[in-house]
């Protein structure tokens, strides 16, 4: 496949819908910095990071008095000071850009479309990783868990779910936990659901993204059988949690790993996540290594 063909394929896969979310009214606790003044945004992020003014001032190497004046609106920070505050608050690139906009500065991080020529090398690398991971499933998702790319094994795992869940943008978490999605096939649904929702909550705490909050609320509302309630806190906890699901080849069990671009300075690329699944037992490994001639 040529680079141009790769770009064309990704352009068809990634629609404007993937990068757009309808945001409903969100409570102050989960509000986005989009709707706040600079002082309100800084106080919100301080609260989310559990930092006092003294803590943040020390981390950012600014005086507590100056930070207090910035938060109260009595002083305007320089761009340099604001970036130091953003770094001390551990803000993702998107949120750093928004903090700069709120203060009247231009954002410093680009947000390119996946179809941009500048993204070509990174996306070729992503596709190479997904392809090399075969015959084990692997996929790439954006910040809202919308599907960007997947290898053949991962696509096979989605066969048979409600077609409405496969309309772009395909949300991987919705497709997993929806009653007409993969949920009926997952044998340890309660445990996996608890694990994923906890991870999603951490993502929300990190980004204050109302679209992720809405997704968390939606997923939390999906039913699951009473027989699949979360395990007792007294039960032995394994080293890692695997997802076990029923397939045409029998029960398959996977461990998951998460990979991100460690040096990304583009918002879109920094938010791209690769989810790679490995066999959690020998039976699953042998079944997948036998080839892709049989459907999963």
Predicted segments with their positions:
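Conserved hydrophobic/aromatic packing and binding residues within compact polymer-binding modules
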Residues: 42, 56-57, 67-70
